[in-house]
Amino acid sequence: YTRFLGKLSELTDMGVEVHFFIGNHDIWCGDYLTKECGVIMHREPLTTEIYGKEFYLAHGDGLGDPDKKFKLLRSMFHSKTLQTMFSAIHPRWSVELGLTWAKHSRQKRADGKEPDYMGENKEHLVLYTKDYLKSHPNINFFIYGHRHIELDLMLSATSRVLILGDWINFF
């Protein structure tokens, strides 16, 4: 990743703001990208105005997912205490543990793939967005990653939700 990190640094050195939304695979990166590359890290969703439009930007991890086991595990992974303890483990073991955990997680899914789009009334991020939109009707664009599907769905005459897709396979 050295060349990629170099390009990030090159962009920020030129004054370009690079924003990174931390997700389920990124919680362990700490402040490295900020200190070394000048990247602006976001641990929570961000609402911002761009060219007169309201944007709600987020990774998407944990938003609207009803799975209680997932929520418990997520809260443990996001614990600063547990992150500090994990960082004390030598990378020889911690990296292997992380890779094994991710492999096991993928194997639990059919064919090891992310589930396809589940439809407007079952997709967690869409349901979350519809609910959020009720109390924040001025937001024009909700943009997420997390789910490895591509989606562009109009929610109203002035609001849409976009899920960016799988950047490895589709871009």
Predicted segment positions?
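Glycine-rich phosphate-binding loop signature in dinucleotide/nucleotide-binding domains
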Residues: M14, I50-G52, K134-N138
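Short low-complexity stretches enriched in small and charged residues
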Residues: S9-V18, E96-T100, D116-E120, I139-N140
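Short, Lys/Arg-enriched charge-dense amphipathic segments
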Residues: T2-S9, M41-E49, Q107-E120, D166-F170
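Core catalytic region of metal-dependent phosphoesterases/phosphodiesterases
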Residues: Y1-I50
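Conserved beta-sheet core of the metallophosphoesterase superfamily
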Residues: G38-E44, Y56, D61, D65-L73, ...
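A generic short-segment signal for beta-strand/edge and adjacent turn/coil regions
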Residues: L11-V18, G23-W28, R109-G112, Y128-L133, ...
